[in-house]
Regions:
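Auxiliary tRNA-acceptor-end handling modules of aminoacyl-tRNA synthetases
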Residues: 1-17
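Short, surface-exposed recognition loops or helix-turn segments adjacent to catalytic cores
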Residues: 156-165, 192-196, 247-253
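Positively charged, Gly/Ser-enriched RNA/tRNA-binding surfaces
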Residues: 16-36, 45-46, 63, 81-96, ...
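A positional/architectural concept
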Residues: 38, 75-78
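Polyanion/phosphate-binding surface patch
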Residues: 43-76
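Short low-complexity, flexible loop/linker segments enriched in glycine and/or proline
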Residues: 53-57, 173-175, 262-265
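Acidic, His- and aromatic-enriched active-site or binding-groove loops in soluble protein domains
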Residues: 61-70, 175-204, 268-270
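Short, conserved secondary-structure transition motifs
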Residues: 161-175
């Protein structure tokens, strides 16, 4: 029997890699020009890292982690995303008191159902600003996103932003949402009923049509925000509206539990159902969750497979190939 590659883990051949090389070089040039430095973290981490960062209620931890016991019966996992590993590395090196602008790139792993734009081994590049409080850093990262799209020739895209407020804001909204949805439990998908118990905010991210129909008349997260984050969102939209298509989306919560403050997502209709190719936000409490002293943080990650599909840049055609022939004198 022929040995095949694992499902959702495709090979990349030379003809595929021409675009990949253009993308990787463009990413590193833009990241470096914006003052970030590269960091590399292991593919394998303690499973506890992702339980405490991504969140026990998330689909990633519950269904998608590639985890196994090593020979010392320690549970370890292939990384499903990059931010948690970067924060762990900074805590481990005792550098939380310093400011960092870092970027990374490499393979990630999630046990998902393979489909267009979604693989079990996929590649991400990301940027993390550590030690930078809310304000200018949000503007810098969105500017970087716009610059990346310009350099890659991606013209048709939209930036969606939202603000997740503070702990009290989330708690008040989640209580109101539960009160609204509890009389309708029989119409909710079982996955969304479970979300309602573990983390009601995640229901906003539901893909179930029946749930989305209910949410159309549910309490809006924006109505629970104080004036300060609302003004912050308005100012960001006004600042960038001449440069790109950008708007507030009050249903945007992102798929990872560690986000606080601003969250954003970049989508393109050209990608179909899996339309997001970049996402990020602020996660000021993550370092404490991982045993650190606390550190402001904001970042984003790009799905490279999805951005490859959008790139308007074509690999150079008819490149001259040079052959070197060694000529020597014969004795």
């Amino acid at each position: 029997v022929d040995i095949q590659s694992l499902r959702g883990m495709p090979d990349l051949f030379p003809e595929d890699l021409e675009k990949w090389h253009i993308l990787e070089k463009t990413l590193s040039k833009v990241f470096l020009s914006c003052g970030t430095k590269e960091i590399r973290t292991p593919l394998l981490e303690s499973t506890e890292l992702f339980n405490r960062s991504v969140g026990n209620s998330s689909d990633i931890v519950n269904k998608e982690l590639y985890s196994f016991l090593d020979r010392n019966d320690k549970s370890i996992s292939l990384r499903p995303e990059g931010s948690a590993s970067v924060i762990r590395a900074i805590i481990q090196k005792k550098q939380e008191h310093e400011k960092h602008k870092l970027w990374y790139q490499g393979p990630m792993f999630r046990y998902e159902r393979p489909q267009k734009g979604r693989f079990r081994q996929f590649h991400q590049a990301g940027v993390e600003y550590l030690g930078y409080e809310e304000g200018l850093s949000e503007y810098e990262l969105i500017s970087m996103v716009i610059q990346l799209n310009q350099r890659l020739g991606i013209k048709k895209y939209k930036i969606k932003i939202n603000h997740l407020g503070d702990k009290d804001t989330k708690e008040n909204f989640c209580n109101a949402l539960k009160l609204f949805l509890e009389p309708h439990l029989d119409t909710l998908h079982e996955k969304d009923v479970a979300r309602l118990e573990s983390n009601p905010l995640r229901i906003l991210d539901s893909k179930e049509e029946s749930t989305q129909n209910l949410l159309a008349t549910a309490p809006r997260f924006q109505d629970f925000l104080s004036e300060s984050p609302k003004t912050f969102l308005t100012n960001i939209v006004q600042h960038f509206t001449d440069q790109c298509d950008i708007a507030v989306d009050s249903s945007l919560v992102r798929g990872l539990d560690y986000y606080t403050g601003l969250v954003f997502e970049v989508v393109s209709e050209d990608l179909g159902a899996q339309d997001a190719f970049l996402g990020g936000g602020r996660y000021d409490h993550l370092s404490k969750e991982l045993g650190g002293k606390g550190m402001e943080a904001i970042g984003f990650a790009i799905g490279l497979e999805r951005i490859i599909d959008l790139m308007q840049i074509q690999p150079l055609q008819n490149v001259q190939k040079v052959a070197f022939i060694t000529v020597g004198e014969q004795d």
